[in-house]
């Protein structure tokens, strides 16, 4: 185990050296926030796990992700102000994929899309490993802002309307003039339709880029933003895959998790937080 850990750390160190050379600047420092092993090699032969094997040479290919030190310092400061401390640091797509795509599925060419508030995080699996990570700066908040502007409500009210529109046929709200309103969920879906198309188009383009300029076989979608009406259908259309092969993942991948609260709704919103835990 010690040799494997050292091998991985050497890989991260090499990745950091490559990054520094590409940046051509010593002013910005970076912090590794996560890495995933693509493939191990035993005497130049690919192997899933090196542990317990004897050999004269070991090698690894891995993906390492770095953030500027200032960003990481900001994250730590926010946690400390809340009276907490950081136990571990990871990436949302790494956390989500450990729950949503078990290792037995990673032989398949699958994309995982975590549609959060400010970003849509993407990871790709193929031939038994995670081959790429990516991100686009567009997600649920863009839809919330669209609802806020259209119905003249504040951001929090618009976010509530967005969430409720995925669960019920009508949504009640009060605009900034204090007028009570009721709107059909289908009308909200129509209001954000162009934004949904824009986001899914960007996600599809990033998936194709990460996957070697070709589409994937299937897509799992997690996170709150992906629950909006039409999201999975639009993404399937832009990727050129059957609509049934782009789907939200929630309770299907959380069956082995025991929840203390029996009344908790088990859906795609919980996948990433549980992966982080």
What do the PLM-derived regions correspond to, one by one?
Residues 73, 141-142:
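A generic alpha-helix surface/boundary motif
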Residues 20-28, 109-115, 157-161, 263-277:
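A polyampholytic, Gly/Pro-enriched intrinsically disordered region
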Residues 1-110, 167-171, 182-189, 210, ...:
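Nucleotide/phosphate-binding catalytic cleft detector across ATP-hydrolyzing
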Residues 46-49, 115-118, 175-178, 205:
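Short hydrophobic/aromatic-rich motifs at helix boundaries and adjacent loops
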Residues 63-67, 80, 87-91, 98-101, ...:
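Helical "lid/coupling" subdomains associated with nucleotide-phosphate turnover
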Residues 103-132, 147:
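Gly/Thr-rich phosphate-binding beta-strand-loop-beta motif of the actin/hexokinase/Hsp70
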């Amino acid at each position: 185990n010690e040799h494997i850990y050292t091998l991985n750390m050497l890989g991260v160190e090499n990745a950091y050296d490559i990054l520094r050379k590409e940046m051509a600047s010593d002013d910005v420092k970076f912090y590794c926030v996560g890495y995933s092993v693509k493939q191990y090699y035993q005497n130049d032969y690919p192997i899933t796990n090196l542990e317990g094997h004897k050999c004269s040479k070991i090698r690894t290919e891995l993906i390492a992700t770095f953030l500027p030190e200032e960003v990481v310092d900001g994250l730590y400061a926010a946690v400390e102000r809340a009276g907490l401390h950081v136990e571990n640091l990871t990436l949302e797509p790494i956390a989500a994929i450990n729950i949503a795509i078990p290792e037995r599925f990673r032989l398949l060419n699958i994309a995982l899309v975590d549609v959060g508030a400010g970003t849509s995080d993407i990871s790709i699996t193929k031939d038994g490993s995670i081959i790429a990570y990516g991100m686009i700066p567009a997600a649920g908040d863009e839809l919330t802002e669209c609802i806020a502007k259209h119905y003249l409500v504040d951001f929090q009210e618009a976010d509530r309307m967005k969430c409720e529109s995925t669960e019920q046929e009508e949504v009640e709200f009060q605009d900034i003039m204090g007028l009570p309103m009721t709107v059909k969920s289908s009308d909200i879906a129509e209001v954000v339709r162009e934004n949904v198309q824009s986001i899914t188009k960007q996600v599809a383009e990033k998936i194709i880029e990460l996957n070697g300029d070709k589409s994937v076989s299937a897509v799992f979608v997690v996170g709150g933003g992906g629950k909006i009406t039409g999201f999975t259908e639009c993404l399937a259309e832009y990727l050129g895959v059957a609509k049934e092969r782009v789907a939200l993942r929630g309770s299907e991948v959380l069956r082995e998790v025991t929840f203390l609260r029996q009344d908790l709704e088990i859906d795609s919103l919980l996948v990433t937080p549980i992966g982080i835990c």
